[in-house]
């Protein structure tokens, strides 16, 4: 990726910059930055495009494709050096190991905390053994003597989970705390007041939410607004060329109310980065074929098409990477745009699907 080649500008009051002073360091920094930064919704906080997803960092006992510490640490350092300084994790990812690796990277490489934007999540159950995935048990886990009150969005659970995340990350605050899902078993007022109090005492700076039904998100926002409490500034939902159900309500609601969209699975678990196989459902395969066709005509990678499409519609997508060259590939989308005709071409075959990523309320 070629640098911007910015030269030190003259100063009307003090004249041209001395090429040996600190101004040149700023110019070098600008030229070495390959990332776009966008406002998170209507806030003043700017996040990197994309946001580095850290679900894949952790322990192979949790998921077999996890990047363990020896590979995860240099990946984080490489991402930071490229300017990808917004990292999204969760307390449940590898049962806390993802957060621990991030904390170790900050300490090992002496990364300035104020130059990072750290996002984590609460609400899920952190397993006491490496191979435990709390979401497998749905509501049943809350009846366990070992896990009662350890998840969900009660005031007690939220405070305990955030304190644990801060210890693992070895930091005093989270830039954005996200609730991982809606909790139908806790009053909304209790949840929103607890989240607001964390902002008030400085342990959290912004609040976000993840996949839920639009009416649930709207209720939570309305409760916060009614009581003068801190509202959510971001929504991390499921969105890609292969899954657009969020366009019905959630995306419209967020756009109208200034909530930033930071979707997960923007590349559909890699399906939008390579030609479709016969195992891919027919409807998805037809869309992927069109993405491939546009990419070939442009001389692009398929990921450029998928990311160009989604970058135009959100604050920043959340993407997990396993290698530095794949980060560089995503960053190469920076100056690429689809034409209106190309957008229509890759969109028009989409057909409605069943809702994904939102647990049933039972």
Swiss-Prot record:
Binding-site list for substrate: 180
Induction section of the entry: Expression is positively regulated by the cluster-specific transcription factor MYCFIDRAFT_198930 and is up-regulated during banana leaves infection.
CDD domains, A to Z: AKR_EcYajO-like
Domain of life according to the entry: Eukaryota
GO molecular function: oxidoreductase activity
EC numbers for this chain: 1.1.1.-
Positions of transmembrane segments: none
KW Repeat (keyword) present: no
Ligand binding (NADP(+)): 88, 210-211, 236, 265-275, 322-330
Active site residues according to the UniProt entry: 93
Pathway: Secondary metabolite biosynthesis
Keyword set, alphabetical order: NADP, Oxidoreductase
Entry annotated with the keyword NADP: yes
InterPro entries listed in its UniProt record: AKR_Detox_Biosynth (IPR050523), NADP_OxRdtase_dom (IPR023210), NADP_OxRdtase_dom_sf (IPR036812)
Cited function: Aldo-keto reductase; part of the gene cluster that mediates the biosynthesis of an emodin derivative that may be involved in black Sigatoka disease of banana. The pathway begins with the synthesis of atrochrysone thioester by the polyketide synthase PKS8-1. The atrochrysone carboxyl ACP thioesterase MYCFIDRAFT_190111 then breaks the thioester bond and releases the atrochrysone carboxylic acid from PKS8-1.
Family designation: Belongs to the aldo/keto reductase family.
Protein name as annotated: Aldo-keto reductase MYCFIDRAFT_87468
Species in which this protein is naturally found: Pseudocercospora fijiensis (strain CIRAD86) (Black leaf streak disease fungus)
């Amino acid at each position: 990726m070629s640098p911007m080649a910015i030269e030190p500008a003259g100063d009307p009051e003090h004249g041209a910059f001395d090429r040996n002073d600190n101004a040149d360091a700023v110019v070098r920094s600008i030229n070495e930055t390959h990332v776009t930064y966008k406002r998170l919704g209507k806030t003043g906080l700017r996040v990197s495009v994309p946001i580095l997803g850290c679900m894949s960092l952790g322990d192979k006992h949790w998921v077999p494709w996890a990047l363990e510490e020896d590979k995860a640490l240099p990946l984080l350092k490489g991402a930071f050096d490229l300017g990808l300084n917004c990292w999204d994790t969760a307390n449940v990812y590898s049962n806390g190991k993802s957060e621990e690796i991030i904390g170790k990277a900050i300490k090992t490489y002496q990364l300035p905390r104020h130059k990072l934007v750290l996002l984590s999540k609460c609400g899920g159950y952190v397993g006491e053994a490496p191979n435990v995935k709390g979401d497998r048990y749905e509501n049943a886990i809350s009846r366990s003597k070992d896990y009662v009150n350890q998840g969900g969005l009660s005031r007690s659970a939220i405070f305990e989970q955030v304190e644990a995340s801060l210890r693992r990350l070895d930091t005093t605050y989270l830039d954005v705390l996200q609730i991982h899902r809606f909790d139908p078993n806790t009053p909304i007022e209790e949840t929103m007041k607890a989240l607001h109090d964390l902002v008030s005492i400085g342990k959290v700076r912004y609040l976000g939410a993840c996949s839920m039904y639009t009416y649930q998100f709207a209720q939570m926002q309305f409760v916060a607004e009614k009581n003068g409490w801190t509202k959510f500034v971001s929504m991390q939902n499921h969105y890609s060329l292969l899954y657009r159900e969020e366009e019905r309500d959630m995306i419209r609601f967020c756009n109208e109310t200034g909530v930033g969209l930071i979707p997960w699975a923007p590349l559909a678990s890699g399906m939008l980065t390579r030609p479709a196989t016969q195992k891919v459902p027919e409807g998805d395969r037809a869309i992927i074929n069109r993405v491939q066709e546009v990419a070939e005509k442009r001389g692009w990678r398929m990921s450029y098409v998928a990311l160009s499409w989604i970058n135009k519609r959100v604050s920043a997508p959340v993407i997990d990477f396993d290698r530095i060259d794949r980060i560089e590939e995503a960053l190469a989308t920076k100056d690429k745009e689809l034409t209106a005709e190309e957008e229509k071409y890759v969109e028009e075959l989409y057909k409605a699907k069943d809702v994904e990523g939102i647990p049933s309320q039972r």
